[in-house]
């Protein structure tokens, strides 16, 4: 899942909760 340009809430729904720390870190850009 790509989270580039996504908001923090969208990132949480798409990736892992731990990715929500201001910005999406590189390892978090691609999730399950």
Swiss-Prot record:
Tell me where on the tree of life, at the top rank, the source sits.
Eukaryota
Specify where it is mainly localized.
Answer: secreted
- Where is the PTM Proline amide found along the chain? 32
- Known PROSITE patterns for this protein? I_CONOTOXIN (PS60019)
Which Pfam family, just one, is annotated for this protein? Conotoxin_I2
Expression by tissue, per the entry, reads: Expressed by the venom duct.
Pharmacophore, annotated site positions: 17, 29
Spell out the disulfide connections. 1-15, 8-20, 14-24, 19-28
Q: Which GO molecular-function terms appear in the entry?
A: potassium channel regulator activity; toxin activity
Location of 4-carboxyglutamate modifications: 9-10
Q: Which GO terms describe its cellular component?
A: extracellular region
Q: Which UniProt keywords apply?
A: Amidation, Disulfide bond, Gamma-carboxyglutamic acid, Ion channel impairing toxin, Neurotoxin, Potassium channel impairing toxin, Secreted, Toxin, Voltage-gated potassium channel impairing toxin
* Compartment(s) of residence: Secreted
What family does this belong to?
Answer: Belongs to the conotoxin I2 superfamily.
Q: Let me see what the UniProt entry remarks about domains.
A: The cysteine framework is XI (C-C-CC-CC-C-C).
- More about this protein: Negative results: has no effect on Kv1.3/KCNA3 channels.
Q: What does this protein do?
A: Kappa-conotoxins bind and inhibit voltage-gated potassium channels. This toxin inhibits Kv1.2/KCNA2 and Kv1.6/KCNA6. Produces stiffening of body, limbs and tail when injected intracranially into mice.
Q: What is this protein called?
A: Kappa-conotoxin SrXIA
Instruction: Give the source species.
Output: Conus spurius (Alphabet cone)
């Amino acid at each position: 899942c790509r989270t580039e340009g996504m908001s923090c809430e969208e990132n949480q729904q798409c990736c892992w909760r731990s990715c929500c720390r201001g910005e999406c870190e590189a390892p978090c850009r691609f999730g399950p």
